[in-house]
Amino acid sequence: MNPGYDCLFKLLLIGDSGVGKSCLLLRFADDPYTESYISTIGVDFKIQTIELDGKTIKLQIWDTAGQERFWTITSSYYRGAHGFLVVYDVTDQESYANVKQWLQEIDRHASENVNKLLVGNKSDLTTKKVVDNTTAKEFADSLGIPFLETSAKNATNVEQAFMTMAAEIKKQMGPGAASGGERPNLKIDSTPVKPAGGGCC
C-alpha cells in the first residue's frame, strides 16, 4: 500500500528551556504564535508533510524539554533521528554557551554524522540581542553545519530552517527515494507514530 509519501525524516529540536523550540515548531506546523510560555514536559511532536525536489517528505518533528531533569528521557529520542535543530536564544548568552553541551549530547546519543543545524531564535528582539550573528556563523562554519537566525514571532526563516534541515538530510541520503505516490498539500497529522525507523522507502 502506498503510504502517500516518499521519505520519513525524524527531526529533533534541542536546546535550553525557554529558547523558543515549541514556538518554532508551532509556527512551522500550525502557524500560530503565542506570547504565553509553557515549558515542554518531556517530549512532544508534530507531523508535517512537505514537497522537496519533487518528493513528498514527511517530517516527524520532536520538541524536547530543555530542563536538565528531562535529559534522560529526551536523550532516548536521539537514536534514529536524521537531523537536529540546535536552538539558542540570541538574547541569552548562556543558552548560546550551552550549545556546545547540546552538541556533545548529540555526539553521545545520536548516530554518527547525523545532520545538524544551528538556530539562533528570537531575532526580532534586536535591541536585546547579545549573541552576534557573525560569531554564531563562524562557530557553525567551524563545525561544518548550516546556521540560521529565526523569529518564531514574525516567522522569519522558520520554514527555511526546517526546509534546510530536510534538504541536508536528503542530500546526505543520496538518490534512492521511491518516486510516485500521492502528492498531498502541506498538512498536519497529529496521529502518534513509532519513534524509531524512518528514512527513504
UniProtKB/Swiss-Prot annotation:
Stated name of the protein: Putative Ras-related protein Rab-1C
Protein role: Protein transport. Probably involved in vesicular traffic.
Gene that this sequence comes from: RAB1C
Family: Belongs to the small GTPase superfamily. Rab family.
Modifications after synthesis and translation: (Microbial infection) Phosphocholinated at Ser-76 by L.pneumophila AnkX, leading to displace GDP dissociation inhibitors (GDI). Both GDP-bound and GTP-bound forms can be phosphocholinated. Dephosphocholinated by L.pneumophila Lem3, restoring accessibility to L.pneumophila GTPase effector LepB.
Record PROSITE patterns: RAB
Main location: membrane
Lineage: Eukaryota, Metazoa, Chordata, Craniata, Vertebrata
Localization per Swiss-Prot or TrEMBL: Membrane; Cytoplasm
Region (Disordered): 174-201
Gene3D superfamilies: P-loop containing nucleotide triphosphate hydrolases (3.40.50.300)
Annotated positions binding GTP: 15-23, 33-40, 63-67, 121-124, 151-153
Keyword Translocase among UniProt keywords: no
Domain of life where this protein originates: Eukaryota
Membrane topology according to the record: Lipid-anchor
EC code: 3.6.5.2
